[in-house]
Amino acid sequence: MEIVKRAIRLMHEGKCIYDQFQLDEDYNVPDAKEDVGNVIEGTVCVKTEDMKLVETYLKISGKAQFKILYMTASLDPQPAVLEGKLPFEEMVYVEQPGEEEYFLKNLRTEFSVSMVHSRKLSLHLLTELEIGRTQMISEEVTEDVESEHAVYKKMKKFRLLGLSDTKKDTYRIKEEITLPGTKESISQILLSEVSGRKLELRPGTDEVTVRGELQVFCLYLSEELKADWVSQVIPYEGKLLCNGLTEGMFYSVEHTLEDTLVDIRMDEDGEMRILGIEGTLLLRMNFYEEQEMELLEDIYSLQEQCIPEKQETIFEELLMQNQSRYKLTERLSLPELKDDVLQVLCSRGEIQIEHTEYREEGIQIEGILHLNFLYLRGDDARPYGSWQGMIPFQHLIECSDLPENVRCTMSHHVDQIQVSMAGSEAVEVRAILAFDAFLRREIELQTIVSVMEKPLDLEQMDKRPGIVGHIVQEKEDLWELAKQYMTTVEGIMNVNELENENVKIGDKLLIFKENMSIL
């Protein structure tokens, strides 16, 4: 007897690993730079360059690239910028390491700069890491059996979710901004911010359409050494090749915008009025498709004894692919700013998830939006300032009748953020927080892995009654009765003149042994 099997691929996600580390360094101002009068703000981008498992530890190394915006200590203070890198190496303990792939799922930083004196700064960096772990596995289901003898099969329909493809790829973004006519030409870039928003992926035939926007802010010095800025949203769209994909597939994506660059370019008139914008979108994509199939649940034969060996296997069923958006609106009273703020120039935010709870109505998320904004002041000696704080939030990703045995892959990011003045001592924060959830339900199947064949015990068969009267009990069906009394479903239906296989509790049936001469 030969078993016909079919393989289904699954992406198993292990428990995430959380780590936190700090870097404290003194930074000496280079000789080519002017003395520091006051620090406006510091920004940092932490990039991991290598991640590998060493026994029971994950060795993570990389660099923290920072920029410090400050005002010079000259008689005529001017904005200036300092740049540098802080290398790091972190050993993270891993519980029960296996043949899994480890990757950086989320990263959040807190960077502060304080003056020791005009030629030395003290840098403090706090970094929080969330490390994901995944392993692709393959499980088999039994669709059929092939035998020399006549066999009777009990089949059941299932709709299972299978991993179609997994892909790590990069999408390179190259765009340009032309300064409006009211802006002066650029001499030097002081500070630039490039963040992604409204990212949308759409699977097609052998390709993935990537669509999104870049929020760009640039603070610069003009040719007359006057500070100015430009802020603009740039849309982008492109395609990535991915053989085997079809339109309508389900997907789960982790994405990060890295290696952003803003440089000055010359326009057709020879003036420095164009900003080149570049960035690399790192994508970890898992594509899934639902597969409808009939699986073999049980088997018997009237010519031999069939003993199936079963194995418990966990598969997945799609619950929901959800792109949930939470609109946050908050008015912050900031008396410490008083009448200091003339205009908010640039704002940025990061999400920190504090607690996730699975409820019957969906997934309840509690977290914090860490907020930072750069603003323009009315003081010519100190024309810029920055503020940072946090806003708590709660959000429900709705999914009615959420089962207990649920698997969830979730990513989050700030899709949009805007800070505007709301009076002399207050600001209004408007943000859209994105939560992309891919929900699956665990299905426990008893899969037939082999069938043992034995000759029938003819002596026992002869002792069986030739005719049996049976009253249908709870959870019984015609197939189970046919197997129990060594007959066929068709035989029971013919004798009892049944039009279909549906029977209910209390029905009275007359059952004949299939090999009796009366039949």
Where is each model-derived feature located?
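Primarily a LysM-type cell-wall glycan-binding module
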Residues: 456-494, 499-519
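Interfacial loop/beta elements and low-complexity acidic/Ser/Thr-rich segments
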Residues: 1-463
